Amino acid sequence: MAELEIRNLHVTAEDKLILNGVSLDVEMGAIHALMGPNGSGKSTLANAIMGHPGLEITEGTITFKGENITEAAPDERSRMGLFMAFQYPVAIPGVTVAKYLRMAVNAHREAKDEEPVKLKDFRKQTEEAMALTNIPKEFSSRYVNDGFSGGEKKRMEILQLAMLRPELAVLDETDSGLDIDALRVVAEGVNSFAGPEMGVLIITHYQRILH
């Protein structure tokens, strides 16, 4: 059984049909790529997987780890192990990267009935993740995506991926707008995280990240 199964998915947004009968399997421990031109519904599919409230699934099912999540709330899907790196990450002025990451990590730990992460352990985990994604330590004291360049925003998404270690990561146009160096960091990060315990779905209209 695939980790994520999508069957005959029909999705509308503002009464307009965007996805018409999409079926897809995403296996655990594999990197999958979904390619297509702009406007073909790739981001709509990603948002439907995560339960975006602005979309309506009129037909079909989404199953994750054997459980039907078609009507599950976004936070419930996240707690189950789904993660999405957004094409256009939003800024959160006043909230530092460190605080944001610790809140996210503790939310996931709470969902597993685990104790909050100790500050010492969190700092060590953050430093290791930043080193892996080639992000300077000073980054943790900045406000989330506030004044970030395009490349920094994408690095922030990969940093979250490194900290949360989800079971399935959906990367929506993560390579969009990146220079060669930033693209390499993203690609290396994805390759290092994908493994037997995590599947990856890359949504893109470029072939370059696949090389």
Q: Where in this protein do the model-derived segments appear?
A:
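The feature captures the beta-strand-to-loop junction immediately N-terminal to the Walker
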Residues: 35-37
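ABC ATPase NBD Q-loop/coupling interface
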Residues: 61-77, 145
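Q-loop/switch helix immediately C-terminal to the Walker
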Residues: 88, 94-110
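ABC ATPase C-loop
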Residues: 161-162
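Conserved structural motif at the start of ABC-family nucleotide-binding domains
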Residues: 4-6, 19
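Walker B catalytic motif
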Residues: 173-174
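Helical segment within the ABC ATPase nucleotide-binding domain
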Residues: 183-196
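Short coil-to-beta microelement around the adenine-binding A-loop and adjacent beta1/P-loop entry
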Residues: 16-17, 76, 184
